[in-house]
Swiss-Prot record:
Keywords: Acetylation, Antiviral defense, ATP-binding, Cytoplasm, Helicase, Hydrolase, Immunity, Isopeptide bond, Methylation, mRNA processing, mRNA splicing, Nucleotide-binding, Nucleus, Phosphoprotein, RNA-binding, RNA-mediated gene silencing, rRNA processing, Transcription, Transcription regulation, Ubl conjugation. This is Probable ATP-dependent RNA helicase DDX17. As an RNA helicase, unwinds RNA and alters RNA structures through ATP binding and hydrolysis. Involved in multiple cellular processes, including pre-mRNA splicing, alternative splicing, ribosomal RNA processing and miRNA processing, as well as transcription regulation. Regulates the alternative splicing of exons exhibiting specific features. For instance, promotes the inclusion of AC-rich alternative exons in CD44 transcripts. This function requires the RNA helicase activity. Affects NFAT5 and histone macro-H2A.1/MACROH2A1 alternative splicing in a CDK9-dependent manner. The keyword ATP-binding applies. A motif (DEAD box) lies at residues 325-328. There is a cross-link at K129, K528 (Glycyl lysine isopeptide (Lys-Gly) (interchain with G-Cter in SUMO2)).
Length: 729
């Protein structure tokens, strides 16, 4: 090429340093002196001096033009990006395989998150005053006597500790004197009365008091702090340009933060309150734009909020209402240093509300450091407790038996009309492997864990909520904060490392006042957690698997295999453990012992039969035969055998009138035993059989058996057929 063409080509290819620096400076709002210092950085040469450091009242990171912005990820569902769970993957938006000029060095990071944030020295005399007590006691509440207050708290299992004088609890939403637009949304969502944590939490939060709320999962804690926050914000001056949020909610995971933001949007839009949700794993641009426009409510995970505070994208000067949601979970995830850095940026006379499901010493220490003269509200037992609306079934098995038992259990669950199920596993690899195996066998399963990109996690949760994929396999990233109302089953494929995680896992079902069932596979390798699990079961009045008791008594000797015969040699009358054991065996033994399941997999059925199977309408069409011979085990006909089974000694009449009792057809077309006959072989003659599971709380009026009260029908399918007669030679 002639040399005369080199210079023009270079002029075209090389961008002007001054223009690029001016573009960056105008986007970041830098001054002229800063643009001059940033100009050499756009096209560095060997002689160029290093950029000068500009001193600001607030530290602000200057973006380097040499580092290119990442392209959008074109394949968000096919790549594994980032590491860790929750918010720890907040640095995913740096250049990687999807960025231009791949292989470039990532931007320089400081050693610890929040290292550049300095603790502010507050002078309360110079800070503007603000009001935080807006509670006006309703006349109906004011007329309550001390005795009636104590009875109301006892009935709702509310315990109040600390503080000078605690307001009386409310027992209706209008007692809290919320604005009419808030009451309208409550009525639209068909809320009739506040939950126990809301009964005492509303008066405390509206009074401007610091408080700690300890309650089980799904107890309505989100509304307990968001509705008072709306009242608090509406009594503050309007935001001005450059102001940060008035209400800050810290949450441990992205999923919980998004759910809180959805609730805040539902209740705040009528009063034109703006809210935003900032979390890692998502693009920073939209989140920064929301903060720059001004939001009254900010729901954030600690890591991403630290990033924005360090870079000067937001500030907490106007924050007067601080909420720490799932405080115990944030400490478990190692966010305590970030939380302390964030709280140091907020004025000390703020109102602080801390919410947790457990009360370990780490959470107590955090409350002592952040809260002033606080009142503690406990709903239920202060000890670790599970939701009493959850039926807990523990199956003691070996590690190698889990897959087989899981498939048998899923065959039973998928026959239910409401069959949304969450399966919890311990590791990300097992989560992917189990999902791959189940999908290969035709199960509509999807998975979620910390290595999934945020778009994929959102997509999976939407598919799960809509019912298109009723099986969700997850790690502990979803064990807290995931709020899906109609989850009916939770399966602990792997038992968690602590009883606290167990309680939060099974708490994904039976949200609010619903019922649910939790299955747990417990292996001898989980022996260290056995005693704590038994305490949780006893506190919830659940029957305890005798294998689990034997595992504790014998320190895991034999894996619980020998205890079976020991318990079965005793009388089965009035033995709740035996009835529990029989029910677990009947549910989980499957085809091998002649159970209620056919050998065909969910994926092997035709579209018509599969739809009927998923809708709980039986096994395919009403006239389809179940077994090798037509009419042998005909479902949907009202009896368990239209023809004789085997020889003449096993006739249909003898079977219907024998030990198994007569059967009746339910509305769904499935055959089930009546409650008076299902235990005909258990108990003493002339004595009313005990309800299955022997739950020790009051049975509702009109209920004929307790298992129906706990969310399951007594027997959804007919009993197994009798064994064939011995062959005669």
């Amino acid at each position: 090429m002639p040399t005369g063409f080199v210079a023009p080509i270079l002029c075209v290819l090389l961008p002007s340093p001054t223009r690029e620096a001016a573009t960056v400076a105008s986007a970041t709002g830098d001054s002229a002196s800063e643009r001059e210092s940033a100009a050499p950085a756009a096209a560095p040469t060997a002689e160029a001096p290093p950029p000068s450091v500009v001193t600001r009242p607030e530290p602000q990171a200057l973006p380097s033009p040499a580092i290119r912005a990442p392209l959008p990820d074109l394949y968000p569902f096919g790549t594994m990006r980032g590491g860790g769970f929750g918010d720890r993957d907040r640095d995913r938006d740096r250049g990687g395989f999807g960025a231009r000029g791949g292989g470039g060095l990532p931007p320089k990071k400081f050693g610890n998150p929040g290292e550049r944030l300095r603790k502010k020295k507050w002078d309360l005399s110079e800070l503007p005053k603000f009001e935080k007590n807006f509670y006006v006691e309703h006349p109906e509440v004011a007329r309550l006597t001390p005795y009636e207050v104590d009875e109301l708290r006892r009935k709702k299992e509310i315990t109040v500790r600390g503080g000078d004088v605690c307001p009386k609890p409310v027992f209706a939403f209008h007692h809290a004197n919320f604005p009419q637009y808030v009451m309208d949304v409550l009525m639209d969502q068909h809320f009739t009365e506040p939950t126990p944590i809301q009964c005492q939490g509303f008066p405390l939060a509206l009074s401007g008091r610091d408080m700690v709320g300890i309650a089980q999962t799904g107890s309505g804690k989100t509304l307990a702090y968001l509705l008072p926050a709306i009242v608090h914000i509406n009594h503050q001056p309007y935001l001005e340009r450059g102001d940060g949020p008035i209400c800050l909610v810290l949450a441990p995971t992205r999923e919980l933060a998004q759910q809180v933001q959805q609730v805040a949007d539902d209740y705040g839009k009528c009063s034109r309150l703006k809210s935003t949700c900032i979390y890692g794993g998502a693009p920073k641009g939209p989140q920064i734009r929301d903060l720059e426009r001004g939001v009254e409510i900010c729901i954030a995970t600690p890591g991403r909020l630290i990033d924005f505070l360090e870079s000067g994208k937001t500030n907490l000067r106007r924050c007067t209402y601080l909420v720490l949601d799932e405080a115990d979970r944030m400490l478990d995830m190692g966010f305590e240093p970030q939380i302390r850095k964030i709280v140091d940026q907020i004025r000390p006379d703020r109102q602080t509300l801390m919410w947790s499901a457990t009360w370990p010493k780490e959470v107590r220490q955090l409350a002592e450091d952040f809260l002033r003269d606080y009142t503690q509200i406990n709903v239920g037992n202060l000890e670790l407790s599970a939701n009493h609306n959850i039926l807990q079934i523990v199956d003691v098995c070996m590690e190698s038996e889990k897959d087989h038992k899981l498939i048998q259990l899923m065959e039973e669950i998928m026959a239910e009309k409401e069959n949304k199920t969450i399966i919890f596993v311990e590791t990300k690899r097992r989560c992917d492997d189990l999902t791959r195996r189940m999908r290969r066998d035709g199960w509509p399963a999807m998975c979620i864990h910390g290595d999934k990109s945020q778009p994929e996690r959102d997509w999976v949760l939407n598919e799960f909520r809509s019912g298109k994929a009723p099986i969700l396999i997850a790690t502990d990233v979803a064990s807290r904060g995931l709020d899906v109302e109609d989850v009916k089953f939770v399966i602990n494929y792997d038992y968690p490392n602590s009883s606290e995680d167990y309680v939060h896992r099974i708490g994904r079902t039976a949200r609010s006042t619903n019922k649910g069932t939790a299955y747990t596979f417990f292996t001898p390798g989980n022996l260290k957690q056995a005693r704590e699990l038994i305490k949780v079961l006893e506190e919830a009045n659940q029957a305890i698997n005798p294998k689990l008791m034997q595992l504790v008594d014998h320190r895991g000797g034999g894996g619980g295999g020998g205890g079976r015969s020991r318990y079965r040699t005793t009388s089965s009358a009035n033995n709740p453990n035996l009835m529990y054991q029989d029910e677990c065996d009947r549910r989980l033994r499957g085809v091998k012992d002649g159970g209620r399941r056919d050998s065909a997999s969910y994926r092997d059925r035709s579209e018509t039969d599969r739809a009927g199977y998923a809708n709980g309408s039986g096994y395919g069409s009403p006239n389809s035969a179940f077994g090798a011979q037509a009419g042998q085990y005909t479902y949907g006909q009202g009896t368990y055998g239209a023809a004789a089974y085997g020889t003449s000694s096993y006739t249909a009449q003898e079977y219907g009138a024998g030990t198994y009792g007569a059967s009746s057809t339910t509305s769904t077309g499935r055959s089930s035993q009546s409650s008076s006959q299902q235990f005909s072989g258990i108990g003493r003659s002339g004595q009313q059989p005990q309800p299955l599971m022997s739950q020790q709380f009051a049975q509702p009026p009109g209920a004929t058996n307790m298992i129906g009260y706990m969310g399951q029908t007594a027997y959804q399918y007919p009993p197994p057929p009798p064994p064939p007669p011995p062959s005669r030679k």
